[in-house]
Amino acid sequence: MRGELPDIPDELGAPSFLKRALKAVSPEDGGGFDRLLPHLLEVRLPAQYVGEEFGIVRKDWDTARLRLALGFPDLYTLGMSYLGMQVLYHLVNRPEEATPTRAAAAGGPYLCERVFYPNADMQELMQRYGVPLYALESKRPLRDFDAVGFSFNNEGAYSNLPRMLRLASIPVWQRDRSDDDPIIIGGGECMLNPEPVADFLDAVAVGDGEELILDIAHCLAELRGAPREKRLAGLSHVPGIYIPSFYRPVCDDKGRFARLEPHDDLPPGVYALERITKRLLNDFARWRPPLKPVIPWVDTASGSANLEVMRGCPQRCRFCHAGHVYLPARFLSAESVVNNTLALATNTGSDWVSLQSLSLLDHPEILQILEQLRPELDRSGVNLGIPSLRMDAVSREVAELMRRPKESSLTFAPEAGTQRLRDAVNKRIKADDIASTFEHCARAGWHKFKLYFMVGFPGETDEDVQSIVDLTRELNRIARTHGSRAPRINVSVNALVPKPHTPLQWAPLVHEEDLRRKHSHLRSEFRALGKRVRLSYTSYEEAFVETLLSRGDRRLAQVLALAEERGLVLQGDAELFDFDAWRQCWEEAGLDAEREVHGERSYETSLPWDHIDSLVRKRFLWSEWQHFLRRSPTPSCFEECVHCGLGCEK
């Protein structure tokens, strides 16, 4: 033993995670984790840094054909709630359990480990003792892996990527890496516009990770030991893989993004398409999710075991990024959902199992699922986690079936208070549906609710903003009238952040003075609704930076690099978000952020993500943008095919 285990106060519980970590430390790890171990109780939630959780997969380092680390550019408590990471970890380490036919073709064995963004106190500890960022399973430095894949499910994590690379002693800029450095890959929902972080990445995986990761692993295993240039050339032949260094951005005479084009002097063997097409998991219904996931030591953001029961959403709300990039809607069968839910509850010991989807009540067998799960879960005392629900699909029966032994809340997203604005964003729910849903839920015993609205839509009026207050007041009255307990309603009002590959990608961000005026009006009006109705909202500064990052081009990488050098963060403690310091970064990088965020865009305007084919045609998105401006809704995918480009009608 190379470090003495410190005394642990009784109130922290048994030091099992530290003892397991100490036992697992190998003299060959080369990262110096043993130097950290005696000091881990100096940091907050030390258990998140030791690994050794139940359900991990440990493989032999020396015999693995490929050593892959999955990086989540945010805290462990968030990353361990992210189902995508569990899915990919399970798929690489145990492919035969998830997709036997693909596993045989992909080869192996492959080794896959995890790494998360460390909190500031842990970063300081690592630097004090000279320990680079390491993977949790083997404790080996991240730089020792063949490849590191980062999942981005929100743009706020972008600023953490250069910091993680620096902590790992891996060159931040792709151009500075050598043959000895790992291949850095970006994936996840945000990589439908990878340009803001493209100069940090060697490769980008566009589309469903289950379709891509074994192909990536097989390619890199076959080329292991080859020069970096040859490995990237090999990856360029994998459908859905984009190699940013093979392309160059072209700007117009005013310094604005004009287009992205392949370099003229690409090395032999490179496959550089003008557009990269998203990979799609078509056989989602036959997909085998991880039923023995890694069980975290500490409480996570979701606090539940998670099961994805549906991918995509047929409703196509015009502001919704996930609703467009995950099209078409795909489902697990009722039998699979029920069996997998019960298996997850048994295997994890969790008293919560969350059914994850964008629009759960659009599942064609949802009533059957709830009817079969309710008695089984009641017997075992397990609660069912329900995501945001459509307000025109909750019957009295559904409201009763969703009730759980443990008190919780229901989440709804009306998005707008007036019918004309709901029609504009294609949120096709009527006022009567909203009222009846609340009545059903109150009669079924629900009394805690979360409501999500948005402001800042083009053409929005003061009446639209006031209607948020009026609708909340009416729903509060309904819940008081028909419920057995006084309701508690939390209302969140977010500013519209225009997202790539959505009809509102052409919309500007609301101006600062306009948003502040709307916030002021809402604060004043909500005070009259009482203490049991609470209002929260995102700031203009947060919306500004998110818009800049979500619709940005490669010039954003310099901004992010400057921010990392100055210790700026976008996520975590709101008090640490320094908008003026961020402004200084983009001004120093020569970026006109005001123009990027508030500028007008036409159909002919080149967009930084035009080279990424989401399978939904740009012409269709433009047509939907025109429908938004006319306040005209369009039918859901279930009602009528609108020929968006996916080819579902074939």
Regions found by a protein language model. Give the residues of each.
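A glycine-rich phosphate-binding loop feature that marks nucleotide/adenosyl-phosphate handling sites
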Residues: 234-245, 358-363, 387-394, 456, ...
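Canonical Radical SAM [4Fe-4S] cluster-binding loop centered on the CxxxCxxC motif
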Residues: 82, 298-335, 643-650
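Acidic, glycine-rich segments characteristic of secretory precursors and extracytoplasmic regions
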Residues: 2-198
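N-terminal pre-triad scaffold of radical SAM enzymes
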Residues: 68-74, 89-92, 293-319, 345, ...
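N-terminal [4Fe-4S]-dependent radical SAM core
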Residues: 37-69, 76-77, 257-306, 615-627
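Radical SAM enzyme core and accessory elements
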Residues: 1-57, 64, 68-70, 99-105, ...
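Conserved SAM/AdoMet-binding glycine-rich loop
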Residues: 71, 77, 156, 342-450, ...
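Glycine-rich beta-alpha loop elements in corrinoid/cobalamin-binding modules
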Residues: 101-106, 117-122, 126-267, 503-553, ...
